């Protein structure tokens, strides 16, 4: 019997691989084709998702079930079910990193939005939603062309904990609130069937969008996946790799740094996929940690499927030695709640794990129910997708003018002006007769998008776009590549700099310095780039404009302090519209308003062990802490830094000076008993709060924002709080609200921050419980301060 099962399994797996790697069809394969297969109950759209999933699982034999446990799911020919590829990528546009997306068909490109770290610098929630929506439209269009799946493994919502991390560029930065809200907006935009205006014009005229109800029925346009769960932010550093690293995380840091983005992605974003990470967390591999994965389902209400990162189930045994055999690794993952393995490990070892009694077939069924439920919510079993709600989306909806305009706007809003001495910028294009552009990234298109970039709609370099403004523009790379190991090209760079009215030096990072599976060892500019900048600055007629590429922070203290370098602009990985956005900002057609979503540390920070996951500073061991919330050391640029060509001023119109928390607690609470016995109460523990009572204590902070300069501009208003130090580990400060507003010259506008004290004024204590410190909370708005007394 065992041998027979093994032979059947091999036949199914071989069939799946053969079908999956056929030439791509111009239309997607789909199940429930009439007349032979549409009569199955799982094809009956009048039944519930759960009923249909249960019906489908009940019809499968064990080898067929096992064939579904890989990202490349096997076909089930006798039921009319074709193979399905779960792994498609859409971090900031459709990408062909995985097998799900291909640009080898009739659709050969897709809109390349700026890398996530750049979009995050806009601090614009609406923009994040719009990007998610646009990528979803292109994803559905690609699916209709047979060139993509319906399940995409984005966004990356790990907190950018260490500036050396090679994948920090993929994240929305270092602040848990910003990361959380980016994740929610992107996922909503990506998954929601009913878009906020974005898709109305794209649905076919004969489809009544309203008849599909809203998203309360659980149906999805596409499936988004929040990754990497959890405490994953190291690729290769020292003797550690992401495959064997054990992230030792305190309960306090887990609660208020590492977990919030995932909790909100599930609770508020309703993500339909969660990806567990390679690393172990406190000694247990993330993909084998049942309490971690089940918390997402039981406490946070996760309804979707859980995938491992690619080969992360294999690492449980092969790299981490957590189990004694592959079968135990597979069993531990399935029991913990992993539904699908990116890779073939479960295909190869699940059957023997069942035969050895290490995992039951019932748990495999549980995994399949989760997988099929998501496919059913996507309409995969509802018949020919060409006749569905999105059936008319096609090549005209990819690289559309609307999407390219959106990509340009995202890049404009995300670019950050870090220095602008004596108002060097903007340049007057009518008064600039010649430009010199220096630097290996200035005329290189290959790394404009950063990691997880597909085939962009347009391929123009920074140099090409600047040439549109000043026809007499010369270029010299200075270095042969970003590593800049030699100064042999300096002479040409110096020569063109001497003869130009203005000089722009493009320096920084590319994917040779920071990427997946590669962390940085230094925070300085690579190789001899610093020397190149200084040599050019020494001969230029006017102070140099320094443009910085890359996702991670760079120590440019030398440039910050050098008067020969008049302006510094960070563009990150700006995507396909990066050159145009940069040129518009340099020449004043767009007023910059981005702010850094990360702290920029000095080179000395590399003395801190990247493997140390502690967020809080510890002076007794010389540990400076991490991110603006806890870091106590020197900074090159602080979180939220960002200049404009105009000046903004604030005025707090109204905010409470006192907040009583007494109504949050039941009469018999331990806190009230403490007070009755004359004990001092230093904080309120949220576990003791009456359910849903926090909403009654929300308050508004009304702010006037005035543009006192001569140029219209958009501006990110940031509201921080500093809580009383009544318990250990309170942040230095934390962001509790932000809003991007556009204010015309010499005008003002009002913005309102709605503050939920249970969320924005709370912190985790040393056992990971949320508490609100009592005492004076100081609210910061630029140079303004406002004291709020939180009492009981």
Swiss-Prot record:
GO BP of this protein: xylan catabolic process
Enzyme class: hydrolase
Glycosylation: residue positions: 44, 104, 124, 239, 444, 618
EC number, as in UniProt: 3.2.1.-
Protein name stated in the entry: Probable beta-D-xylosidase 6
SUPFAM superfamilies referenced in this protein's UniProt entry, alphabetically: (Trans)glycosidases, Beta-D-glucan exohydrolase, C-terminal domain
Organism the protein comes from: Arabidopsis thaliana
Protein family according to the UniProt entry: Belongs to the glycosyl hydrolase 3 family.
Pfam family, one: Fn3-like
Domain of life: Eukaryota
Major site of localization recorded for this protein: secreted
Molecular function terms, GO-annotated: xylan 1,4-beta-xylosidase activity
Active site feature: 309
Keywords tagged on the record: Extracellular matrix, Glycoprotein, Glycosidase, Hydrolase, Secreted, Signal
Signal peptide start and end residues: 1-18
């Amino acid at each position: 019997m065992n041998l027979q099962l093994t032979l059947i399994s091999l036949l199914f797996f071989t069939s799946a691989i053969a079908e999956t790697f056929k030439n791509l069809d111009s239309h997607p394969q789909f199940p429930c084709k009439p007349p032979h297969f549409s009569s199955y109950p799982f094809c009956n759209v009048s039944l519930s998702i759960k009923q249909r999933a249960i019906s489908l699982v009940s019809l499968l034999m064990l080898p067929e079930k096992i064939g579904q446990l890989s990202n490349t799911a096997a076909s089930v020919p006798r039921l009319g079910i074709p193979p399905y590829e779960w792994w498609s990528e859409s971090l900031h546009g459709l990408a062909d990193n995985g097998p799900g997306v291909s640009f080898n068909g009739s659709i050969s490109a897709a809109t390349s939005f700026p890398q996530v770290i750049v979009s995050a610098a806009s601090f614009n929630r609406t923009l994040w939603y719009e990007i998610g929506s646009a990528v979803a439209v292109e994803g559905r269009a690609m699916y209709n062309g047979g060139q993509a799946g319906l399940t995409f493994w984005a966004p990356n919502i790990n907190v950018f904990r260490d500036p050396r991390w090679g994948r920090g560029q993929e994240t929305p930065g270092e602040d848990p609130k910003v990361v959380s809200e980016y994740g929610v907006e992107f996922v909503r935009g990506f998954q929601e069937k009913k878009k906020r205006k974005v898709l109305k014009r794209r649905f076919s005229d004969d489809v009544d969008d309203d008849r599909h109800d809203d998203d309360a029925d659980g149906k999805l346009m596409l499936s988004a996946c929040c990754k990497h769960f959890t405490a994953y932010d190291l690729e290769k550093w020292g003797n550690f790799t992401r495959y064997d690293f054990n992230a030792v995380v305190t309960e306090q840091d887990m609660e208020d740094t590492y977990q919030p983005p995932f909790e909100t992605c599930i609770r508020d974003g309703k993500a339909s996929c969660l990806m567990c990470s390679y690393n172990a967390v406190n000694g247990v591999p993330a993909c084998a940690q049942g309490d971690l994965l089940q918390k997402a389902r039981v406490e946070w209400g996760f309804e979707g499927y859980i995938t491992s990162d690619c080969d992360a189930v294999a690492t449980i045994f092969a790299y981490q030695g957590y189990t004694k055999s592959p079968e135990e690794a597979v069993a531990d993952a399935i029991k913990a709640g992993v539904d699908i393995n990116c890779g073939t490990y479960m295909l190869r070892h699940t059957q023997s794990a069942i035969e050895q009694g290490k995992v039951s077939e019932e748990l495999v069924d549980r995994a399949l129910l989760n997988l099929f439920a998501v496919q059913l919510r996507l309409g995969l079993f509802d018949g020919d997708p060409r006749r569905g709600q999105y059936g008319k989306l096609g090549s005209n909806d990819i690289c559309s003018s609307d999407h390219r305009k959106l990509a340009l706007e995202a890049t404009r809003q995300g670019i950050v002006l870090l220095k602008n001495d004596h108002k060097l910028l903007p340049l007057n294009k009518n008064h600039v007769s010649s430009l010199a552009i220096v630097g290996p990234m200035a005329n290189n298109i290959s790394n404009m998008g950063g990691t997880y970039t597909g085939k962009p709609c347009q391929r123009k370099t920074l140099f090409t776009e600047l040439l549109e403004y000043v026809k007499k523009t010369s270029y010299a790379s200075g270095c042969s590549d970003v590593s800049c190991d030699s100064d042999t090209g300096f002479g040409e760079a110096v020569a063109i700099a001497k003869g130009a009215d203005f000089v722009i030096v493009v320096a920084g990072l590319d994917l040779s310095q920071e990427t997946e599976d590669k962390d940085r060892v230094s925070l300085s500019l690579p190789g001899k780039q610093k020397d190149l900048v200084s040599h050019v600055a020494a001969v230029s007629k006017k102070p140099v404009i320094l443009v910085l590429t890359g996702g991670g922070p760079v120590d440019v203290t030398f440039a910050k302090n050098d008067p020969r370098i008049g302006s510094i602009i960070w563009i990150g990985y700006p995507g396909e519209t990066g050159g145009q956005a940069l040129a518009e900002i340099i020449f004043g057609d767009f007023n910059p308003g981005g702010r850094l979503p990360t702290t920029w540390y000095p080179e000395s920070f590399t003395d801190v062990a990247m493997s140390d996951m502690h967020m809080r500073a510890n002076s007794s061991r010389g540990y400076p802490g991490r991110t603006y919330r806890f870091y106590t050391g020197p900074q090159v640029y602080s979180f939220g830094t960002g200049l404009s060509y105009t000046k903004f001023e604030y005025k707090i119109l109204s905010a409470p000076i006192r907040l009583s928390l007494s109504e949050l607690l039941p009469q018999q609470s331990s806190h009230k008993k403490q007070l009755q016995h004359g004990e001092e109460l230093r904080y309120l523990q949220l576990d003791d709060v009456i359910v849903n009572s926090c909403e009654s204590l929300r308050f508004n902070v009304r702010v006037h924002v005035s543009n006192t300069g001569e140029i219209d501009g958009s501006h990110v208003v940031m509201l921080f709080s500093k809580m009383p130090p009544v318990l250990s580990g309170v942040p230095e400060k934390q962001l509790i609200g932000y809003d991007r507003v556009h204010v015309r010259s010499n005008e003002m506008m009002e913005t309102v921050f709605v503050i939920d004290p249970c969320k924005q004024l709370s912190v985790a204590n040393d056992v990971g419980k949320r508490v609100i410190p009592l005492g004076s909370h100081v609210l910061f708005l630029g140079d303004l301060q406002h004291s709020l007394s939180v009492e009981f």
